[in-house]
C-alpha cells in the first residue's frame, strides 16, 4: 500500500473525519515550507522504520543527518528530536513516543507530503507495533537495532515482547530490505528473524559477539572487528562484504560503535554509502540526550539515559586512568501522574519501579564515587521519599547527598568536580517536561542547565 493510499484510509476512519480542520492544518504546513503540495510532492517517498530495545534513536539520527548531507530531503521522527520543516515542533525537542495513534500517522504523512520529502526516517517502538499502527505503513527498509527480552518487562512478558518485535518483520513486501543488529539476543532468535520474510536481509554485529554466540562471520554483512574508545571519541574498523573501512567520531561510549555500524549497514543496503561522506557526517555528530558530552576545564559532563551501558564505558576509561572520579546525578520515576497511561498506576508497576531502583543503586555502589540524588518525574510520590529509598539501597557504600531540585543537583555536581572527573547526568536524556506531582509539571532540560552553569562559571 503506497503512502497516499494509507493517508486516504486514515482520513476515512470515523475518528478522523474532521477534514476541514485537517485541510487548514495541512495548508499551514505547506505555507511554512513555502511550497504547495502539488508542486513539491514526490511520488515515491522512501520510508525507513527503525525499532529495537536500544540504539534506534541514534541509528535513526545518523541516517537522517547523512541523507541531509547528501542533499536529500529527509524528515526524521525520533524520541530525541523531530526534524520536519513542515511541523510546528521545535527541533531538538524530545518526543516521548514518535506516533501513538492513527491521527499521529496521518499528521506525519501530511508533513512529508507538504515538504515534498524524499525520505522519512521513523523510530518505531513496540507500542506502535502492538496497536497495529505500522501494519499499513509501506516501509522500504525495516531495521532491528538489537533485542533484549527484559527491556520493557513492566509492560510485556518476555514472550509478548519478542512476538511484537518479530511481527514488525513479518508480512513484508519482497522488495523491502531488512537489517538486523545482532547483539543482546541469541543465535536462535536471529535465525527466526532471518526466516520471518522473503526480503533481502543484512546483519551487523561485532567480531566478539559473533565468536561468543557461534554465528558464521561470513553471514554478517558488517562486522566490527576493532574498537578504540578514549575521551576523544571512538575509532573503529569495520568489514563490509569484501571491504574494510576505518571510522572515527567524537561520539563517545563503546555501545555507540554498533549504532554507527548499524547506520552504515542501512546505507550500504540502500546503495547510498560513501566512506568519506560518512566519516565527515559522524565526525562531530551530536544527538540530543544521547551520549551528549561537554569537555570543559579538564572535566567531562555526560548526558545520557542509559545507566548500565554508560557506566560500563566510563569504568573502562577509569581503568585506563583517562578519568578520575565518576559523579552521577540521578533520580527515579514515580507513579500516579494524572495523564500517564493506566499501567503506570498499577501495583505491579510500583513493585517493578522498586526493583529497578535497587538495581540502579547496586550498579552505582560498584562503579562510582559520588551520587547526587534528585527529582525525575516523581508524579504522585514525594521526591524526598524516592531519594531516601535510593539512599537506603546505597547502604553508605558510596558518598551520596539528596538535592531535591534537579537544577541545583546538576550545579553542585559540576561545582564539586575536580580536573579529570566525570559528571554523568542520568535518566532523562533530552526530555524537557518533568512531572513533579500528581497534577503538575515543570520544564527543565538537562543540557540547558549544564550550559547555563558552565556559562556562569566562565567555563
Predicted regions mapped to residue ranges:
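Walker A (P-loop) phosphate-binding motif
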Residues: 32-84
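A short, gly/pro- and small-residue-rich
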Residues: 139-146, 161-167, 201-205, 435-457
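Active-site phosphate/ATP/adenylate-binding loop shared across adenylate-forming ligases
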Residues: 61-116, 212-217, 227
